[in-house]
Design a protein with these regions (language model features):
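Nucleotidyltransferase catalytic core that binds NTPs
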Residues: 1-98, 106, 110, 130, ...
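Structured beta-strand/loop patches that form or line metal/cofactor-binding pockets in enzymes
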Residues: 117
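Short, basic/aromatic-enriched C-terminal tail that caps enzymatic domains
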Residues: 113, 121-137
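Substrate/ligand-engaging "lid" and interaction regions
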Residues: 103
Length: 137
């Protein structure tokens, strides 16, 4: 087995990064370096699943990403509540005719549900047709 000193992981699946980091920090002398999510011109995070989408579906996913970026800005400025996020989730589903598994804000440090005056991250999993996309902002 190898014993690396450093591991580089993308933030695209932030929940996975969080759990792996927690596990590794307890068991190994390995430093995890989070790497920013790479996005296309429409703010859609790059993923191998994007190849399963048609041009129109990619455009739709990009519009959804732009909507979520605006929602994240509102979260920072207006201290959105969980109830407001639930309302936005319903708006998003209706506007883009998509199924959403989850749309929620969580504390970056411990993944607890939305907390005021803390560093929160918006998490989403949704479907464009049959392709499930995940992201966080």
């Amino acid at each position: 087995l190898i014993n690396p000193k450093y591991t580089f992981m993308g933030e695209k699946d932030f929940q996975q990064l969080f759990l792996v980091n927690k596990f590794i920090s307890k068991k190994y002398k390995n430093k995890i370096y989070p790497c920013r999510t790479v996005r296309d011109k429409n703010f859609l995070s790059l993923s191998s699943r994007n190849f399963l989408l048609s041009k129109n579906e990619l455009n739709k996913a990009g519009q959804i990403s732009k909507y979520l970026f605006k929602l994240k800005s509102s979260l920072k400025k207006n201290n959105l509540t969980n109830n407001n996020i639930l309302i936005k989730k319903k708006e998003l589903q209706k506007k883009f005719n998509i199924k959403i598994d989850y749309l929620e804000a969580r504390n970056e440090k411990n993944l607890t549900i939305l907390t005021k005056n803390k560093k929160n991250r918006l998490f989403v999993a949704y479907y464009v047709n049959k392709v499930r996309l995940i992201d966080n902002f």
